[in-house]
Amino acid sequence: MQLEMHLKKWLNNKGDTMVITKIINAIKVGQLDEKLTTLYGAEALTSQKVRYEEVLSKAKDLLGDEEAHIFSAPGRTEVGGNHTDHQLGRVVAASIDLDVIAVVVPTDDSIVTYHAKGFSVNPVDLHNLEINEAEKNTTESLIRGIAAGFTKKGYKVGGFKAYSESNVLSGGGMSSSAAFEVLIGTIFSHLYNDAAISSEEIAKIGQFSENVYFMKASGLLDQMACSVGSFAAMDFANKENPQVTSIPFNPADYGYDLILTDVKASHADLSDEYSAVPYEMKAVSKLFGKEVLSQITLNELLANAAKIRNEVSDRAFLRAYHFLTETNRAKLQAEALKENDIKTFLRLVKESGHSSYMYLQNVLIPGDSQNQALAIALALSETVLGDDGAYRVHGGGFAGTIQAYVPHAKTAEYIALMEATFGKDCCYKLRIRDCGGICVI
């Protein structure tokens, strides 16, 4: 955590505010090279400079050539603890180099005018922070909810104009909505609160906004992973104040590329499958008179296997078994990361994937023999990687993405096979990002 705070302080050292044209020129002559390299890596510097210049140019057209800041908030990848957060278990996640960036112009009114590539957002007046049923599931509700969360805690908010673009994959387990929430929270923190609000506090406000204003049940995993930076070990046993530990670690330092593969399977009509996972887990915990599975032990579960089979279901028992072994595995993964033990870490990643496939059962869709893309991706990963590397289903499962740690020497072969099967650009070679939401300039 100390390293992450030091890095964040350096990145947030903005210097004099510049108009957008001057920021573009500063990027062209290399004045932001060091910061951009820190965020995205040396090999991505050229492409990121082009990206930033294009976003700034569009912002100038929309917002005028005003004094501005650039903000960035990362997506995340789940590393361990598949479907454990909703049972108040342990999780390991990491911030990644795919992010949402925004050019922001402060205003002296209460209006947030937010422009984003690909969709339109109505202006939000922060004088009205009431919950609006008509805004359910909208970007406007998230902005209003974050502002409400700030004011409830005694923080300041104010207006701004912004233009943003994101390369965080929507629906791929990278938490694009949480990245947006962290972005807005970081903007309010820097513009109106002297950047004094902690990453953890910004994450909690984002969760509040999503639950209460966006009206979607959300744990704290996504927001915390996007806000804290680097690898983060989380323990949700204390629901209101989860324990979060940032762990500096980079698989690339040990010869592995972190690759997510989007199998291009539709999430449509899968809501029942997703909701069945926490429902069945909680049905088991209820049998023990507990709210969630983290409040029982593996020995208690095993001793009551017959009762669970009779009174709930076989699958519910298996999913509970997955949770209790997976939450402990996440703890062991965090310990391996702290000790820089890549061998143990990768073994645990494979064990996590095995448990998700066998016991959690979120790889195959029941009754659908025509659509088993995640299973195919895992089979191909096993073929290429063998015993060197690791692979697992990533995120909610049933569709979406798988995660693999691929030796550098096999990366080209791995990506080629995946693209031949699932289509061009289905693979995302990720870089671990050592900080969460920041003000770049």
Regions found by a protein language model. Give the residues of each.
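Glycine- and acidic-rich phosphate- and metal-coordinating loops
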Residues: 147-170
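Structural signature of FAD isoalloxazine-binding scaffolds in flavoprotein oxidoreductases
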Residues: 90-108, 228
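DPxDG-like acidic metal-binding loop motif
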Residues: 95-96, 174-194, 406
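Phosphate-handling active-site elements
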Residues: 152-160, 188-202, 408-421
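Beta-strand segments within the central parallel beta-sheet cores of soluble alpha/beta enzyme folds
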Residues: 113-115, 159-166, 196-208, 317, ...
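Alpha/beta catalytic cores of group-transfer enzymes, especially the acyltransferase/condensing modules
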Residues: 194-242, 352, 378-381, 391-394
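C-terminal nucleotide
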Residues: 10-76, 101, 105-136, 233-392, ...
